[in-house]
C-alpha cells in the first residue's frame, strides 16, 4: 500500500494509529490473527501512544532509537554475519557483510564519486569479515564500534603512508581469506585515491565512536529471526532525511528481508505469523535495497508493506527504471490524502482516470423573416479529478482518494477508485483501545511512557569492549621508484 500525503495531512492519526489497532487486535486462536508489526516512527508518537496496550495484548514491544540511544533496545548488524559464519555458511556471511557495507555507506551520483563509494564499501566489508572471522576476537567485541576502532588505529600510522598498519594487517591474511580479497583495492591505493576511500568510510562510521551508539549496536535485543517468528511490535525512530543514523534502521530492514526466506521455508512457505511494515515517513530512510523485491515477492510469504511519503519524489533514490516504477506498480492500493507537489497531483489525476462529459449547446438567430434556433449535443473525455482540484481537497472534509487494483479471486466491486471518509483516531473505537483523548491527556500519556524508557539507563554503563588486532610493528618498506612511477595518476 502506498500512501501519499504532505505535512499536516493526518497520516498518523487518521490511518497509521487505527491500522496498528486493527493489525494487532484479536486472539491467536480467533479468526483475526494479530500480526507482527514493524513501524517507522518519526516523533516516537506511535510507540508512546500504543506501546502500553500492545504489551497488554501480549506483544514484545521493542524500540530502535539512534537519536536517544539511552532509550533504545540493542541491535547488532554484525550478529547475522557472525551467526552465518559460525553455522558454516561462509558465502552467506560474506553476502551479509557486503549488504551491511552497502547500506551504511550511502551511494553517490557521479561516476568518480561512485568509485570512492564502492572502494569504501569493499574496505568496510573486509574489516567486518576480519572482525567476525578472527578467532582471537571475543564475541562481545564483534560490533561496529570495534570496526571503527580498527579503522582509526590502522590509518593513523606515523610513517609515510598512515594507512600502512591496516594494509599490513590485511596483507598478513591468507590469500583465500574473504577479507583480503575485498581489501585489495585499498591495499594497492595511494595518494588522493587512498585519502578519498578512507575519508568516505570514516565519515559514514564516525557515529559509532559515540559510547551510547556503540552500546546500542553491540547487543541483540532486536533479532531479525526472532521478530519474524514471535509476536512482536518493533518501532524504529526515524530522523530527518539524510541523517546517517537512519542507516542503522535500513540495515535492519535488509536483514529482516534476508531472514524471511529461511524462516518461511522452514514453516512451509509462509512466515509463522503475518508481518506488516508500516513505513511512516519512509522517504526519510536511506535507500532500502530490498524494497522492490519485498513488494514483488513479500505477499507470498505473508509480508506486507504500507509506505507513507510526503511526495513521490522521495522514491527517486530507488531509480526510475527498476526502483520507483516497480514500487508504485506493485502497490495494489494507493491512497492520496493531501498532495502538495505538482508531480503528485498529475500522477494521481492520471491514475484516477477520465470520465465522459456530455455537453449541450444552443444557438439562435433573428432575421427580417423571423428567428431560428438549433441545439447540438457532444461528449468528450475529461479528467475525473483535475490537477488543480487536489489543492482544494481536505482529508477531514473531502475524504481521501483510494485507487485499488483488481486481484484474482476478489470481486470487481472491491477494485477501482473510491472516495473514502477519514477522521481522527479519537472518533473511532481506537480511542478506547489505546486510551486516547485530549491533547493534554495524550501529552501526559506520552511523557509517562518516555519516563519509563529513560529509566532503562539507570545503573547501565554505555561503555563496550573493543578488540584490537596485532598490527605489524614496523611498516613495510615503500616501493622503490622506477621508470613506471611517473605514470601513476592520483
Which sequence ranges carry the predicted segments?
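P-loop NTPase motor domains
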Residues: 2-303, 389-416, 421-490
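Conserved ATP-driven motor cores of ASCE-family P-loop NTPases powering translocation/secretion/packaging/pilus
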Residues: 295-297, 301-401, 465, 482-488
Amino acid at each position: 500500500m502506498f500512501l501519499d500525503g504532505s505535512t499536516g495531512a493526518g497520516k498518523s492519526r487518521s490511518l497509521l494509529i487505527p491500522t496498528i489497532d486493527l493489525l494487532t487486535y484479536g486472539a491467536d486462536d480467533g479468526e483475526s490473527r494479530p500480526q507482527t508489526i514493524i513501524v517507522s516512527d518519526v516523533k516516537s508518537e506511535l510507540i508512546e501512544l500504543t506501546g502500553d496496550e500492545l504489551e497488554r495484548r501480549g506483544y514484545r514491544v521493542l524500540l530502535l532509537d539512534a537519536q536517544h540511544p539511552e532509550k533504545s533496545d540493542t541491535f547488532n548488524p554484525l550478529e547475522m554475519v557472525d551467526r552465518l559464519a559460525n553455522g558454516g555458511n561462509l558465502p552467506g556471511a560474506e553476502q551479509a557483510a557486503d549488504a551491511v557495507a552497502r547500506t551504511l555507506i550511502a551511494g553517490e551520483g557521479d561516476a568518480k564519486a561512485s568509485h570512492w563509494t564502492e572502494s569504501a564499501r569493499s574496505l568496510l566489508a573486509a574489516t567486518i569479515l576480519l572482525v567476525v572471522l578472527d578467532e582471537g576476537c571475543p564475541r562481545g567485541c564483534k560490533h561496529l564500534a570495534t570496526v571503527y576502532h580498527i579503522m582509526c588505529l590502522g590509518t593513523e600510522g606515523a610513517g609515510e603512508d598512515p594507512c600502512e598498519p591496516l594494509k599490513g594487517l590485511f596483507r598478513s591474511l591468507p590469500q583465500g581469506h574473504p577479507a583480503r580479497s575485498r581489501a585489495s583495492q585499498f591495499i594497492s591505493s595511494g595518494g588522493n585515491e587512498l585519502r578519498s576511500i578512507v575519508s568516505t568510510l570514516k565519515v559514514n562510521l564516525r557515529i559509532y565512536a559515540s559510547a551510547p551508539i556503540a552500546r546500542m549496536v553491540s547487543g541483540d535485543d532486536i533479532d531479525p529471526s526472532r521478530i519474524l517468528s514471535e509476536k512482536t511490535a518493533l518501532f524504529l525512530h526515524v530522523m530527518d532525511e539524510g541523517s546517517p543514523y537512519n542507516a542503522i534502521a535500513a540495515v535492519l530492514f535488509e536483514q529482516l528481508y534476508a531472514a524471511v526466506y529461511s524462516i518461511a521455508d522452514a514453516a512451509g512457505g509462509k512466515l509463522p505469523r503475518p508481518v506488516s511494515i508500516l513505513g511512516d515517513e519512509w522517504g526519510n530512510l536511506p535507500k532500502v535495497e530490498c524494497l522492490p523485491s519485498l513488494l514483488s515477492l513479500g505477499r507470498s510469504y505473508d509480508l506486507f508493506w504500507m509506505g507513507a511519503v510526503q511526495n513521490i519524489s522521495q522514491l527517486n533514490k530507488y531509480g526510475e527504471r527498476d526502483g520507483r516504477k516497480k514500487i508504485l506498480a506493485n502497490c495494489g492500493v494507493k491512497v492520496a490524502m493531501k498532495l502538495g507537489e505538482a508531480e503528485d497531483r498529475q500522477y494521481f489525476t492520471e491514475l484516477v482516470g477520465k470520465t465522459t462529459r456530455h455537453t449541450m449547446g444552443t444557438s439562435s438567430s433573428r432575421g427580417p423573416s423571423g428567428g431560428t434556433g438549433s441545439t447540438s449535443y457532444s461528449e468528450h473525455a475529461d479528467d475525473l479529478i483535475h490537477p488543480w482540484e487536489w489543492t482544494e481537497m481536505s482529508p477531514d472534509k473531502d475524504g481521501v482518494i483510494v485507487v485499488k487494483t483488481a486481484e484474482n479471486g476478489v470481486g470487481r466491486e472491491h477494485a477501482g477508485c473510491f472516495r473514502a471518509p477519514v477522521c481522527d483516531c479519537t472518533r473511532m473505537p481506537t480511542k478506547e483501545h489505546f486510551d486516547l483523548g485530549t491533547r493534554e491527556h495524550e501529552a501526559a500519556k506520552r511523557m509517562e511512557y518516555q519516563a519509563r524508557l529513560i529509566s532503562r539507563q539507570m545503573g547501565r554503563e554505555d561503555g563496550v569492549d573493543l578488540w584490537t588486532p596485532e598490527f605489524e610493528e614496523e611498516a613495510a618498506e615503500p616501493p622503490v621508484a622506477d621508470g613506471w612511477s611517473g605514470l601513476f595518476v592520483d
